[in-house]
Amino acid sequence: MLYGKENRDEAEFLEPIFGSESEQVDLPKYKLAQQSIEPRVAYQLVQDEMLDEGNARLNLATFCQTYMEPEAVKLMSQTLEKNAIDKSEYPRTTEIENRCVNMIADLWNASEKEKFMGTSTIGSSEACMLGGMAMKFSWRKRAEKLGLDINAKKPNLVISSGYQVCWEKFCVYWDIEMREVPMDREHMSINLEKVMDYVDEYTIGVVGIMGITYTGRYDDIKALDNLIEEYNKQTDYKVYIHVDAASGGLYAPFVEPELEWDFRLKNVISINTSGHKYGLVYPGVGWVLWRDKKYLPEELIFKVSYLGGELPTMAINFSHSASQLIGQYYNFVRYGFDGYKAIHERTHKVAMYLAEEIEKTGMFEIMNDGAQLPIVCYKLKENSNRGWNLYDLADRLLMKGWQVPAYPLPKNLENEIIQRLVIRADFGMNMAFNYVQDMQEAIDALNKAHILFHQEPENKTYGFTH
């Protein structure tokens, strides 16, 4: 049979690429569309909007978990509609939250002689807010009892300049003076020689960080506890420690169980962590615990109806899905202590390997080698003979899909530009091999390229939001 040319214009108009004329309508962007469209078309249109987004697995900027097992995802998808705040309607979900709090308290060595308290949150930012509020209210009670004029000065919070931004928000929201202990090259975590200089009778508490966002290093919480203990012996205006363990809280107990940073220390009264970081759950879930209920002021606790009675709650957020709680409990049941330990130790090995390979290039100074948290940080050596900087390297790596942040360190070190690799449980050794190869190719390309490089007079942050 012979075929001739046909006019396809009309046929193409009547046969949209998704088999539906509704696809021909512009995708609503800033105003709600007038008409409905087919669900499969809506799905495809929205999915297409995200085609050029980065691959989360290759995002080495984020601490957040980017992979969970299909069984976990199935459980979580089956509980998306459950509102975790509805305690009486979903008593088993409430019990699961309670079990998670108890398991975490055990990991953090809560004493059987004390009555610990804890709650879930939607992340460590909310958990830090709760921990901070408890410190402020407790300080106010102690100060009033001792006759201190609480209106004479603004209360203050002492913390390393490597703090996570939620602490700045806390201080702004609740009118607290943030006293930052500066970092320097010799003190890449809280400076124990200077920290007590920032403490006075108006200090609501000192925050120790288990995993500084910029570098991944731990503050020496035990040494800080010793300093606080000596201070408290000499004054009636007691000061206590809140540990921001957003990253390290569900990592250190498995990898360094002998490290004393938790409720084993006398002056550590509260701790927060993120379940969606090294707790291995998708965002967002966090946890905050107090070593004893006396450190959690009653006025911060509210009562909700529960099985004909009342249940205490203190979360800032109200309605939120129970799915992340279910995901956390699944992981605790699935992995157990040994499973978490094995996963985190493998992640630790990957981080150490990457630090070694990056150092072998001879171009970088390792700022953090992943010996504690599996975070690798490095800067260009000052004497390295090159015409490019870390922002250029970040651009080049992005061409391969790798999202690697480059940013300045906090004040007092703001001229130090570093890159940071956050190694997560889903970043295996094979991916590490690929990264090393792609990084070397990127360096070779930059060394040979004849292009205009970044020459900004001011430092900037590239792909990094802490």
UniProtKB/Swiss-Prot annotation:
It catalyses: L-glutamate + H(+) = 4-aminobutanoate + CO2. Belongs to the group II decarboxylase family. GO terms for molecular function: aromatic-L-amino-acid decarboxylase activity; glutamate decarboxylase activity; pyridoxal phosphate binding. InterPro entries: Glutamate_decarboxylase, PyrdxlP-dep_de-COase, PyrdxlP-dep_Trfase, PyrdxlP-dep_Trfase_major. GO terms for cellular component: cytosol. Converts internalized glutamate to GABA and increases the internal pH. Involved in glutamate-dependent acid resistance. GO terms for biological process: glutamate catabolic process. It holds the Pfam family Pyridoxal_deC. This is Glutamate decarboxylase. NCBIfam families: Glu-decarb-GAD. Keywords: Decarboxylase, Lyase, Pyridoxal phosphate.
